[in-house]
Amino acid sequence: MTKSPIGGNRSGRKLGQKVKKGKLKASSRRWLERHINDPYVQRAQLEGYRARAAFKLLEIDEKHKILAGARRIIDLGAAPGSWSQIAAKVTNSTDADPRVAAIDFLEMDPIPGVRFLQLDFLDPEAPEKLKEAIGGTPDLVLSDMAAPTTGHRQTDHLRTMHLCEVAAHFAVDVLAKGGHFLAKTFQGGTERDLLNMLKQNFSQVIHVKPASSRTESVEMFLLAKGFKGRRKAETEEPAEDAAAE
């Protein structure tokens, strides 16, 4: 497992902690108890990552090797920044020679070597600003974007799939040949047009669900490996159907 890019709090906490009732609603108390007793939350604190999401990327990379050799990385929906932390480390990015560009409409504390844009990725100016910020051609586009949930599963799925589609078209527009694209999606079916587009442009398209993604969560990740290049992609037939792991 890849080590933390920065030092972290080594104190840790014991699992099985309870939250006092106080004024919290039962549902809020259960969520808080699950959060503070989550082993991935505790590992993130111990290893210096900003969120447990770091381990989702690390687990996917452990099997699919998407970080190795990446010279420049773009991180969409970056806040609070755990994926950007990993990206900065694997690319040896520094403030003097930044090789990671990140974007989110939420605030994010600075990370050495990461150029951060506080901007909605759906803003028409966002793609060009990211291209300027990265200062070269990225080998990897990451997207952990998800629309705010409404509680209505189909609505949440459609809204997050829209973000995934926009991210995928952006990746095809900016990636270096041989590059990879990883994006969050929700279980419930991936739109055929999106899958067909990815199959035309990448050598392999699969769905993955890392162990650190909570079992009850509908979250999955769509991984497209081996970008064929823009000219070649326009003339080739689609690759095999996307597989689920």
From Swiss-Prot:
* This protein's UniProt keywords: Cytoplasm, Methyltransferase, rRNA processing, S-adenosyl-L-methionine, Transferase
**Signal sequence: where?**
none
Q: One Pfam family, please name it.
A: FtsJ
- Tell me a GO cellular component: cytoplasm
Q: Gene3D superfamilies recorded for this chain? A: Vaccinia Virus protein VP39 (3.40.50.150)
Residues that coordinate or bind S-adenosyl-L-methionine = G81, W83, D104, D120, D144
Tell me the superkingdom of the source: Bacteria
Which CDD domains does the entry mention? AdoMet_MTases
- Keyword Protein biosynthesis attached: no
Major place of residence: cytoplasm
Citing just one GO molecular function, the answer is:
rRNA (uridine-2'-O-)-methyltransferase activity
The segments labelled Disordered in the record are 1-25
Enumerate the subcellular locations listed in this protein's record, separating them with semicolons: Cytoplasm
Recorded hits in InterPro entries, A to Z, give: RNA_methyltr_RlmE, RNA_MeTrfase_FtsJ_dom, rRNA-MeTfrase_E, SAM-dependent_MTases_sf
Q: What is its EC number?
A: 2.1.1.166
Q: Which PANTHER family match?
A: RIBOSOMAL RNA METHYLTRANSFERASE, RRNA METHYLTRANSFERASE 2, MITOCHONDRIAL
Q: What is this protein called?
A: Ribosomal RNA large subunit methyltransferase E
Q: What is the originating organism of this protein?
A: Sinorhizobium fredii (strain NBRC 101917 / NGR234)
Which gene specifies this protein's sequence? rlmE
